[in-house]
């Protein structure tokens, strides 16, 4: 039997549907601060990446491609008998969401992505940062490597997360297998979506956590020559949906229900 992404739903199926996809080293716990309010206004679908949360980790490397993720999102939509839905991609999932919206624009009522260096970061800069991280990691693997805390993106280093949410996200990241991390990295380069922005036809918005300074550099470059690019600044950092949950929730309702 073919592996399928794990997903769950909350809210009234008669309401407008909204797909939420979390980022790397995370799980559906990413959306904990958003579900009470969004679940009142939408039929929320939460999907987990391969090897994250309760999603399986396929053996075949061919499953770790953009087209396969796009097909999985379509499978979920079809299985739920939804004609269309809004799509939100957080961090690593931003590139996946953009590719899905371009492949199936007729199914997407609107697209929102959050801060994402994998989708919008300068490739040359990313290479330098990766080399620097590898240098640091080589000298500090020991105990930290056992629970992935040698990775700079591990949520243990997040400074603005509520304690209960942080505890769940840290547990998710600690328990990620090395195989899941390595396979998830197979599509890292393919996630870069800067060249695709102008091909997005559904309504599109970037929910920008202004405290992540490195992403502001990427965003400034994205805005150049794109005066119509919709960006909503929020008082949060990389995990803007958590750190600025009230702003994020209100913006999602406005964007998807009152465009």
What is each residue range found by the language model?
Residues 8, 45-92, 250:
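Active-site loop/oxyanion-hole signature of alpha/beta-hydrolase fold enzymes
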Residues 203-236, 242:
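Conserved loop-alpha-helix segment in the C-terminal half of the alpha/beta-hydrolase fold
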Residues 1-19, 39-43, 78, 82-83, ...:
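Alpha/beta-hydrolase fold catalytic core
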Residues 5-62, 222:
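Conserved HGGG/HGGXW glycine-rich cap/lid loop of the alpha/beta-hydrolase fold
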Residues 242-254:
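Post-His helix in hydrolase/transferase enzymes
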Residues 98-103, 109-141:
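Flexible "cap/lid" loop of the alpha/beta hydrolase fold
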Residues 122-128, 142-198:
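Conserved alpha/beta-hydrolase catalytic His-Asp/Glu region
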Residues 17, 43, 83-86, 107-110, ...:
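Structural signature of beta-strand start/N-cap positions in the alpha/beta core
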């Amino acid at each position: 039997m073919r592996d399928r992404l794990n997903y769950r739903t909350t809210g009234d199926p008669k309401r407008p549907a909204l797909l939420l996809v979390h980022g790397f080293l995370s799980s559906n716990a990413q959306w904990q601060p958003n579900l009470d309010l969004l679940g009142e206004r939408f039929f929320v679908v939460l999907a987990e990446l391969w090897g994250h949360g309760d999603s399986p980790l396929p053996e075949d490397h061919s499953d770790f491609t953009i087209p396969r993720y796009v097909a999985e999102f379509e499978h979920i939509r079809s299985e739920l008998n939804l004609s269309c839905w809004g799509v939100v991609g957080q961090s690593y999932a931003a590139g996946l969401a953009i590719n899905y919206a371009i492949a199936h624009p007729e199914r997407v009522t609107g697209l929102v992505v959050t801060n994402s260096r994998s989708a919008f970061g300068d490739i040359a800069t990313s290479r330098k940062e990766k080399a620097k991280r590898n240098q640091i990691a080589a000298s500090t693997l020991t105990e930290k490597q056992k629970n992935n805390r040698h990775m700079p993106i591990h949520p243990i280093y997040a400074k603005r997360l509520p304690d209960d949410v942080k505890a769940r996200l840290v547990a998710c990241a600690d328990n990620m297998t090395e195989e899941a991390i390595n396979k998830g990295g197979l599509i890292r380069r393919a996630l870069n979506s800067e060249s695709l922005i102008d091909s997005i036809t559904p309504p599109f918005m970037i929910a920008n956590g202004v405290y992540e300074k490195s992403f502001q550099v990427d965003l400034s470059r994205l805005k150049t020559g794109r005066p119509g690019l919709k960006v909503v600044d929020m008082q949060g950092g990389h995990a803007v949906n958590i750190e600025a949950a009230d702003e994020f929730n209100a913006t999602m309702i406005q964007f998807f229900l009152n465009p």
